[in-house]
């Protein structure tokens, strides 16, 4: 095959049957298929080139730019007093900083803007949501026992793992960010590394479902609560329980370890909130504030506030320094199922309900600052904040995982209520009550005061503006929907139809001067007492001259089209016609404005080739000195009749 180091240049030798290259789909195709594959080319991926993927619009929320901006800005900012204030314009989005930079203003971190809804192919309830310590991915625990990993910036699917044989009920990361512990309905505990490698499992940790997990500050111990009425403290290294706290008379639904102390709080089906000393294993205190099952308990990062949620639709805040209730939050209409403190603002937290609503609260305010009544179609089982604090994730019984972000400067206020959110083909630009969002007109121009751009009109083809905008003041009357097409706006002053014949000529003369404000030379045959308009007068789109539109050959011009050339026949005769004003500026106005007296003879037409002063006019772009004036072709029709000429 080789001769002198060169490859044989004859016909290519066929490959032996055993060395034939198999395609990626060879498992489904007979090797003796009657269309053999061509020669193998290592530089061409013939299989990958044939795959067609549908282009979809995907929204990405990246916090990198805000962090870079914060690093640049804090070099010269001594404190929050040196921080610049964001202006309510879209251009100010480049100046946004992370949530930690606005520690004195928690309202800047309200994550109520819907971003994305992630859905698994295996439709089942999402019981737990948990961000990775770096915030790059989100891990969800489902009713099917699967871990699903979603990208934390583009929210697309990354990986799915069958982690448990039964529904996952609890997940927690260690503070050193190296291990994750999960529990399921069968009472099994499992240890996971960052790469989702299962390193240890305890299948007899509890007799019933493990409802919640929490690590201590040193990561040497963690606690768990179960429906078997016990709270257990575990040695993390040995994975053995050191003590079992028995004091609840029923299922224990939630547990949380104090941020800095050896103190546990638990809430259960017996409507009690209990405090425990993990060193001695004894109960310290019981709080009897709720009248139904306590579903969630959370310590604040300051270590002094304790937040509890119950099926009685009430959220309570306790201060452990005085062991008294600080505040009750009432706003939910169904069971409060989940709670989450913001990582940067200690007074800001969110809550989820069994009716699918999510409320945003600030300590010191009784009512929710933001309420999203239809965030989910079913119960919100868990809420989790991104470590940076700009994203909120919610897992629900409606099988979806939803992401929420904070608003940018000049965002639509309706976005706060999730009424104009979504970006896919089904939900793009949706608004309540099937109200379609307005689209801006691509043609610039003046529009009716008080209306948006799409509700206004293009001058000359839509609803007319008021003749005197100053007469309306602050009380603008709405325009009826059945109003006929009108003319572009006229300058302030009385309407020409209300003036006498002599005043109409003066008014029309003023309009002709305003139609060419940039011509400093006087128009031909201009009266000597009229001066050219000053150069400081404002220009408006309806004041600019319009080019002449010629009709096609062999057709009559439309009635609304101004004509400045002579036309033979009965329409060109001026026997009994009254002088009329030019129609070029009042296009679309009522016909009575341009017609003469009712008893005047002759057809009501313009004197051809004459303007408002009964003198020849120069039409820009048509009969200027640089163009050769040519008579247009005669329109088809009968010759002029002498009888019509004298009538």
Curated annotation (Swiss-Prot):
Stretches with biased composition (Low complexity): 478-487, 496-519, 526-538
Keyword Repeat tagged: yes
Positions annotated as WD repeat: 121-160, 163-202, 205-244, 247-286, 289-328, 331-371, 375-414
InterPro entries named among the record's database cross-references: G-protein_beta_WD-40_rep (IPR020472), Pfs2-like (IPR045245), WD40/YVTN_repeat-like_dom_sf (IPR015943), WD40_repeat_CS (IPR019775), WD40_repeat_dom_sf (IPR036322), WD40_rpt (IPR001680)
Gene3D superfamilies cross-referenced by the UniProt entry: YVTN repeat-like/Quinoprotein amine dehydrogenase
BP-aspect Gene Ontology terms: cell differentiation; flower development; mRNA 3'-end processing
Name of the protein: Flowering time control protein FY
Annotated function: Plays a role in the regulation of flowering time in the autonomous flowering pathway by decreasing FLOWERING LOCUS C mRNA levels. Required for the negative autoregulation of FCA expression. Acts probably as an RNA 3' end-processing factor. Required for growth and development in plants.
Subunit structure and binding partners: Interacts transiently (via the PPLPP motifs) with FCA (via the WW domain). Interacts with CPSF73-I, CPSF73-II, CPSF100 and CPSF160 in the CPSF complex. The FCA/FY interaction leads to changes in FY/CPSF complex composition.
Bilayer-crossing regions: none
GO annotation, cellular component aspect: nucleus
Chain intervals with Pro residues compositional bias: 548-558, 632-641
Biased composition (Polar residues): 20-30
SMART domains: WD40
Expression sites (tissue/organ): Expressed in embryos, in shoot and root meristems and in the vasculature.
Subcellular localization: Nucleus
Protein encoded by which gene: FY
UniProt KW keywords: Developmental protein, Differentiation, Flowering, Nucleus, Repeat, WD repeat
Main localization (coarse): nucleus
Impact noted for substituting residue 488 to S: Increased FLC levels and late flowering
């Amino acid at each position: 095959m080789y001769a002198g180091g060169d490859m044989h240049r004859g016909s290519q030798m066929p490959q032996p049957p055993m060395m034939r290259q198999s395609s990626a789909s060879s498992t489904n195709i007979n090797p003796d298929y009657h269309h053999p594959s061509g020669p193998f080319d290592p530089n061409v991926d013939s299989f990958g080139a044939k795959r067609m993927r549908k282009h979809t619009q995907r929204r990405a929320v990246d916090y990198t730019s805000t962090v870079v901006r914060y690093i640049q800005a804090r070099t010269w900012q001594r404190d929050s007093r040196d921080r610049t204030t964001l202006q309510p314009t879209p251009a100010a989005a480049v100046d946004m900083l992370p949530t930690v930079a606005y520690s004195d203003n928690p309202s800047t971190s309200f994550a109520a803007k819907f971003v994305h809804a992630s859905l698994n192919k295996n439709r089942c309830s999402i019981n737990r949501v948990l961000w990775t310590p770096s915030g790059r991915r989100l891990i969800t625990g489902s009713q099917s026992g699967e871990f699903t990993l979603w990208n934390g910036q583009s929210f697309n699917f990354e990986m799915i793992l069958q982690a448990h044989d039964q529904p996952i009920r609890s997940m927690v990361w260690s503070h050193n960010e190296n291990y994750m512990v999960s529990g399921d309905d069968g009472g099994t505990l499992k240890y996971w590394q960052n790469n989702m490698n299962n390193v240890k499992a305890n299948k007899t940790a509890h007799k019933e479902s493990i409802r919640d997990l929490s690590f201590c500050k040193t990561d040497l111990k963690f606690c768990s609560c179960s429906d078997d009425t016990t709270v257990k403290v575990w040695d993390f290294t040995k994975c053995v329980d050191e003590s079992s706290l028995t004091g609840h008379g029923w299922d224990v639904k939630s547990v949380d370890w104090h941020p800095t102390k050896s103190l546990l709080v638990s809430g259960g089906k017996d409507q009690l909130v209990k405090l425990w000393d993990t060193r001695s294993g004894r109960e310290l205190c019981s709080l009897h504030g709720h009248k139904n099952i306590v579903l969630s308990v959370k310590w604040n990062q300051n270590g002094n506030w304790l937040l509890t949620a119950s099926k009685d639709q009430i959220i309570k805040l306790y201060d452990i320094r005085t062991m008294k209730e600080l505040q009750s939050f009432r706003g939910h209409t169904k069971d409060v199922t989940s709670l989450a403190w913001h990582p940067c603002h200690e007074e800001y937290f969110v809550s989820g309900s069994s009716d699918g609503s999510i409320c945003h609260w600030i300590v010191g305010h009784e009512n929710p600052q933001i309420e999203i009544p239809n965030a989910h179609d079913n119960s919100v089982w868990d809420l989790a904040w991104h470590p940076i604090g700009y994203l909120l994730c919610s897992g629900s019984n409606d099988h979806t995982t939803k992401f929420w972000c904070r608003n940018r400067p000049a965002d639509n206020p309706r976005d706060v209520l999730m009424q104009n959110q979504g970006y896919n083909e089904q939900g793009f630009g949706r608004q309540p009550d099937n109200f379609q969002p307005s689209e801006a007109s691509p043609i610039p121009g003046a529009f009716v005061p008080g209306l948006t751009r799409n509700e206004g009109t293009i001058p000359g083809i839509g609803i007319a503006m008021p003749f005197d905008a100053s007469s309306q003041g602050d009380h603008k009357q709405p325009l009826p929907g059945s109003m006929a097409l009108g003319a572009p706006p006229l300058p302030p002053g009385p309407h020409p139809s209300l003036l006498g014949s002599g005043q109409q000529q003066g008014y029309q003369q003023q309009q002709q001067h305003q139609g060419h404000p940039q011509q400093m030379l006087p128009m031909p045959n201009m009266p000597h007492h009229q001066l050219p308009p000053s150069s400081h007068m404002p220009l408006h789109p309806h004041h600019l001259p319009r080019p002449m539109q010629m009709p096609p050959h062999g057709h009559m011009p439309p009635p609304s089209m101004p004509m400045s050339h002579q036309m033979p026949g009965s329409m060109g005769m001026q026997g009994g016609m009254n002088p009329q004003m030019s129609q070029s500026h009042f296009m679309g106005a009522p016909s009575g404005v341009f017609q003469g007296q009712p008893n005047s003879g002759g057809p009501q037409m313009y004197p051809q080739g004459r303007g408002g002063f009964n003198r020849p006019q120069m039409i820009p772009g048509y009969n200027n000195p640089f163009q050769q004036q040519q008579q247009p072709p005669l329109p088809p029709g009968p010759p002029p009749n002498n009888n019509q000429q004298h009538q």
